[in-house]
């Protein structure tokens, strides 16, 4: 099966780099799925985005992303985020509490984290 190179980087660290067969996320213009050989594009991610990377023969990666941009080129997909967390790094109870915050940024971050752990769509 064809693969695409994916690199996810946050301001403070490189999150993940590897091969995937499909990438799904939410942008400011809607949900988008990226397959190998996708046309080039640049998109702004929503503040409560979750990135899912499907991998051939491996478990899907689910990463909560706080804002940022996605670039798709012939070389693959690059996501540059303000912050990002793997599903395994997220405390669901804390994420749920954050999602109910009066602060819009904190609430968005909480929703992204809940999406990453599969608690909400």
UniProtKB/Swiss-Prot annotation:
A GO cellular component entry from the record? plasma membrane
Protein name (Swiss-Prot/TrEMBL): ATP synthase epsilon chain
Ion transport keyword on record:
yes
Q: How does it sit in the membrane?
A: Peripheral membrane protein
Its quaternary structure? F-type ATPases have 2 components, CF(1) - the catalytic core - and CF(0) - the membrane proton channel. CF(1) has five subunits: alpha(3), beta(3), gamma(1), delta(1), epsilon(1). CF(0) has three main subunits: a, b and c.
Cite a single GO MF annotation.
ATP binding
Q: Name one Pfam family in it.
A: ATP-synt_DE_N
Gene of origin?
atpC
For this chain, the family text in UniProt reads: Belongs to the ATPase epsilon chain family.
Function in brief: Produces ATP from ADP in the presence of a proton gradient across the membrane.
InterPro entries with a match to the protein in the record: ATP_synth_F1_dsu/esu, ATP_synth_F1_dsu/esu_N, ATPsynth_dsu/esu_N
The protein's matches in PANTHER family, at most eight in alphabetical order, are given as:
ATP SYNTHASE DELTA/EPSILON CHAIN, ATP SYNTHASE EPSILON CHAIN, CHLOROPLASTIC
Organism source for this protein? Mycobacterium marinum (strain ATCC BAA-535 / M)
Please provide the record's keywords in A-Z order.
ATP synthesis, Cell membrane, CF(1), Hydrogen ion transport, Ion transport, Membrane, Transport
């Amino acid at each position: 099966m064809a693969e695409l190179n994916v690199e996810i980087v946050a301001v403070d660290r490189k999150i993940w780099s590897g091969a995937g067969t499909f990438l799904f996320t939410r942008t400011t213009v809607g949900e988008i799925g990226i397959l190998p050989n996708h046309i080039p594009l640049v998109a702004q991610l929503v503040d409560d985005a979750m990135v899912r990377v499907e991998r051939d023969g491996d478990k899907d990666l689910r990463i909560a992303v706080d804002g940022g941009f996605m670039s798709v080129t012939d070389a693959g997909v690059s996501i540059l985020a303000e912050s990002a967390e793997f599903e395994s790094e997220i405390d669901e109870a804390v994420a749920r509490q954050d999602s109910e915050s009066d602060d819009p940024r904190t609430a968005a971050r909480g929703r992204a984290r809940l999406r990453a752990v599969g608690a909400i769509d």
